[in-house]
Amino acid sequence: MLTAVTGINWGDEGKGRVIDLLAEQADVVVRYQGGNNAGHTVVTTQGKFVLNLLPSGILHPGVVCVLGDGMVVDLEHLSREIHEIEKKGIRVTPDHLKLSKRATISMPWHKVQDELEENRLAKTGSAFGSTRRGIAYAYSDKYRKKTLRLGDLFHLKEDSVKARLKTMLVAKNLELAGCYHQEPMSYPALLTWCEEQAELFGPYIADTGEYLEQAVSEGKKVV
């Protein structure tokens, strides 16, 4: 059985609360889009949990949580979020959490761009009010095909992926230098960052479309 929870663009509508209630009876809880700019707070007997990327289903034993194709994932933030809930006794494993190989990676430069642009606008009193987490920049690059997807982390040794990464970095360094007079980012440092994320999150990355198709065919409850 499939259950979809969506809003009508009013902002804080209580979607997370509804999902938390539905998750109690679900087998799989999927977040299909967004990044870590959103958030919801869940209070249980184990404490207070503030979640930005993880669905609240992560707090329910036996529920599989999926971060879907449409998401932009800040892997450093996700690592911290997992660490925080594990400190309160919630164990997170690749059997419990699956990341779509087609989801977009929020790259280090996305937060840098967001911060610099917001600071520039603030000087003229026209700051946008951004969360400074790089979400808009990550989505912009997603649609311009100027970023990596999680599945690319499996192929960092391939020349084609290295070439794409270098091309993206050259363009970003031109933007950062031309618009904000910033020092260029280093390719070796960026590649090392990608390799570290691959080692940490590789076991969690999966073909979630295939997984969900199988879950539905088996009659599982998917929210």
Identify the residue ranges that each predicted region occupies.
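Non-transmembrane, aqueous-exposed alpha-helical and coiled segments at domain scale
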Residues: M1-V223
